[in-house]
Amino acid sequence: MTSDPLASPSFADRWRRGQQLFWTWLADLRLAILLLLAIAIASATGTVIEQGQSLAFYQENYPTDPALFGFLSWRWILSLGLDHVYRAGWFLGLLILFGASLTACTFRRQWPALRAAQRWQFYQEPRQFTKLALSASLPQGKLDSLEPLLLQRRYRLFRADDVLYARRGLAGRVGPILVHAGMLVVLGGAIWGSLGGFYAQEMIPSGETFQVRNIVDAGPWSGSRIPQDWAVKVNRFWIDYAPDGRIDQFYSDLSVVDREGQEQDRQTIHVNQPLRYGGLTFYQADWAIAAAQVRLNNSPVLQLPMAQLPAAGRIWGTFVPTKPDLSSGVSLIAKDLQGTAVIYGSNGEPLGTLRKGMAIEVEGIRLSLVDLVGSTGLQIKSDPGIPWVYAGFLFVMVGVVCSYVSHAQVWALEQDGQLYIGGRSNRALVAFEQEMLAVLAQLDAQSNHSAETAIA
C-alpha cells in the first residue's frame, strides 16, 4: 500500500518552503522597484504615443516603412496595446502585481515592525544595557529625577518599582504602513478609473442640445456612467480676441437639462475652468465655425453649414448659391468668428470682403452676412477613480510626514545605588544622542546638588 504523496511530510515541507520563498520574493524591495520602473516606462509610453486614435491615424503616423526607431510601427502599437496603454491587460497586471508586492511587504515587514514597537519589556539586569548603542550609569541617580526630564521631552512612561521604560514617536513606525496603504488606494483608483471611465469628444454648434455619444475610449465597465436621462445645451459660444487678432480665450455657456428640458445647472466654461456634473467633466478644448447665416436679396436668413478646408491654418468655407437650381454660386471663406469673410467667385478670383451686417453685390445678387455661428469643441471625461487617487495621495503624504518622526526608546534601572540608563532611536541618531547627554547632565547636576545638600 503506497502512501499519499500529498500527505507525506516531505511534500508538506516542500510546500511550506515554496510558499515561504514565494512570499519572500513578492515582498522583496528589488521586485517593487523593478515593477515601479516598468510602470513608469509604460506610463511614459502612453504619454508619448497618442491614445485612443483610429487605425488610420496610427497607419499614417507610424508607418511600417520606415518604422520609428527602426521597429515601432502601427502593427506593434496595436498588437502590444500601446494605443490604449492604461487599459491594456499587461499594464493592469503590472499594477496588480505591484499592489500585491506592497501588500506582502506591509504584512511581512512593516506590520511586524509596528507590533514589535508596541511590545516592550523592562530591563531588570545591568548587563541588558550593554547591548544598547547608547548607555550610561550614574551613581546615586534616581528614577524619580529621571521621570520629569523624560516627560518634558514628550516621552510616554511605563514604570514598575525600580525599572522604567519610555518611548516617543510611535507614529514613525506607522508612517511606512500609511505610505503603503496610500499607494494601494492610488493603484486601486487607477485600475477602477481605467475599467470604469470613458473619454468622449463633441463639436456642438451654438444653440444645440446634445447627449454624450461620440465615445473615443471607454473601459469595459463604463456603460452605466454614460448619461441617459440628461443632456447639455450650448446656449452660446464666443471667442475673446486680443488687439493683435490672436485668440485670448474662448467660452461656452452650457446648461444641463433633464428629459423635460428643465435646466438643472448652468455654467460658463473656458480653458482650465470645466463644468462638472453627474460624475462627468466637460472641458473647453477646441472650436470651429459651424455655419454662416446669410441673406440673398430680401430672402429669409439662410444658415449654410461650413466645413474646414484642407489648407494651412484654420480656414472654413461654404458654397452660397446664386441661382435657384444651384448651378452657380460663390464661396464664402472665414478664418475666425470676428465677423469677416472673403467671397470668391466660381473661377477662384476674390470678389471682395464681407463683414457682419454688411452686403456685397455678386453675380447680380445682394449677399448679406448676418452672422457666423461657432461650434464649441468639448472633451468629456469620466474617471471614477480620481477621488480614490486623491485620497491615496493624502494617505501617502501623511505617511511620509509620519515617517520622519523618530521612534526613540529609553530604559532605566535603579539598583544598588546606581542608575542605569540606555536608549536607541531608529533615525536622527545624533539628535537623540545629544538629548540623552543633556538628560544625563541634568541628572548628574541634580545628584551633585543632592550630595552637597546632604553634606551640609
Swiss-Prot record:
GO terms (BP aspect): cytochrome complex assembly
One Pfam family hit: ResB
Positions of transmembrane segments: 29-49, 88-108, 174-194
Cellular component GO terms held in the UniProt record: plasma membrane-derived thylakoid membrane
PANTHER family: CYTOCHROME C BIOGENESIS PROTEIN CCS1, CHLOROPLASTIC
Quaternary structure (record): May interact with CcsA.
Protein name: Cytochrome c biogenesis protein CcsB
Organism: Synechococcus elongatus (strain ATCC 33912 / PCC 7942 / FACHB-805)
